[in-house]
Amino acid sequence: MRYKHVFAVCAYKDSPYLEQCIRSLKAQTVPSHIIICTSTPSSYIDRLAWKYGLQVCVRQGESGIKDDWNFAYSMAEGELVTIAHQDDMYHRDYSARLL
């Protein structure tokens, strides 16, 4: 499925900020599709994904910011893609203003 806008959240290990990031994306006034992308899969990331109904995309190979972010972009099936880092917080009108 091709979405108008996708947030691709890059998650690295067990960041204590990841849930706050996800909450800010789920609170958008105009909803966007959200995926979590990681090269460091963990039960912590899986639990948050399950809690918020999000898909987890796992990149094989060594972790590296360039390759991880390119992977996240490639996994997002959208006309517009926002790469969200695990400690980013987005204003609730971000998607509305973007679209």
Which residues does each PLM region occupy?
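N-proximal low-complexity "stem/linker" segments adjacent to membrane-targeting elements
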Residues: M1-S24
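Short, acidic, metal-binding catalytic loop of nucleotide-sugar glycosyltransferases
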Residues: R23-S32
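A conserved acidic beta->alpha catalytic loop
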Residues: C37-I45
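Active-site acidic Asp-centered loop
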Residues: S39, A84-Q86
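Active-site regions of enzymes building and remodeling cell-envelope glycoconjugates
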Residues: W50-V58
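Glycine-rich, basic loop-to-helix element that forms the pyrophosphate-binding segment
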Residues: Q60-A76
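Short aromatic/hydrophobic "clamp" motif used to bind/position activated sugar donors
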Residues: V81
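Acidic donor-binding/catalytic loop of UDP-sugar-dependent glycosyltransferases
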Residues: D88-L99
